[in-house]
From Swiss-Prot:
Disruption phenotype: Abnormal expression of genes encoding virulence proteins. Decreases fitness in the spleen of mouse. It is found in: Cytoplasm. It comes from Salmonella typhimurium (strain LT2 / SGSC1412 / ATCC 700720). This is Transcriptional regulatory protein BasR. Residues 2-116 form the Response regulatory domain.
């Protein structure tokens, strides 16, 4: 499960990323609306934490735009403003929850868990590709009804490949998923985890797209 954090305060951003990773989430952090939009276009996120005071665009305006583009991920707003009108406006344009600075990390974690539970209970938590099934909310995967034993890195790779099933995923995107779990991955880290994942889901299910990356297909080659 991956979270996007949008916060222009560098120290706070680093602290939020570390806190999210400590809770077991993969995490990307950016400091501008432009970078956040690029991240949404190129990746898949289960939730976004959004500060309203961004340097290049008002956070509420940015949120309005991404909702108009049909991004449905839950959004938790962070802000220093605590007026009733601010909260109402944020919720009206598409925020799912609202947290006022300064805040305790325990409350942030609790709100993230609640938003993810609520979103997953809306029926968006399960993916199926051929004989593979993945439950995003529970971090579980099955092959032919048998639960797979996956490391966090293997789960991150499988979820990315299943979300883009039938389409190639660039190595850099997959490498970044691994990097969220590994501070200093070696150059062959991705290949090692792809090899291990193939052993579990079927060697022919994950195809190498030469010069680009990897692609998950629905059926195994006989």
């Amino acid at each position: 499960m991956k979270i996007l954090i949008v916060e222009d305060d560098t120290l706070l951003l680093q602290g939020l990323i570390l806190a999210a990773q400590t809770e077991g989430y993969a995490c990307d952090g950016v400091s501008t609306a432009r970078a956040a939009e690029h991240s949404l276009e190129s990746g898949h996120y289960s939730l976004m934490v959004l500060d309203l005071g961004l340097p290049d665009e008002d956070g509420l305006h940015f949120l309005t735009r991404i909702r108009q583009k049909k991004y449905t991920l839950p959004v938790l707003i962070l802000t220093a403003h605590d007026t009733l009108n601010d909260r109402i406006t944020g919720l009206d344009v598409g925020a799912d929850d609202y947290l006022v600075k300064p805040f305790a990390l325990e409350e942030l974690h609790a709100r993230i868990r609640a938003l993810l539970r609520r979103h997953n209970n809306q029926g968006e938590s399960e993916l199926t590709v051929g004989n593979l099934t993945l439950n995003i909310g529970r971090h579980q995967a099955w092959r032919d009804g048998q639960e797979l034993t996956l490391t966090p890195k293997e789960y991150a790779l499988l979820s990315r490949l299943m979300l883009k099933a039938g389409s190639p995923v660039h190595r850099e995107i997959l490498y970044n998923d691994i990097y969220n779990w590994d501070n200093e991955p070696s150059t062959n880290t991705l290949e090692v985890h792809i090899h291990n994942l193939r052993d579990k889901v079927g060697k022919s299910r994950i195809r190498t797209v030469r010069g680009f990356g990897y692609m998950l297909v629905a059926t195994e080659e006989s």
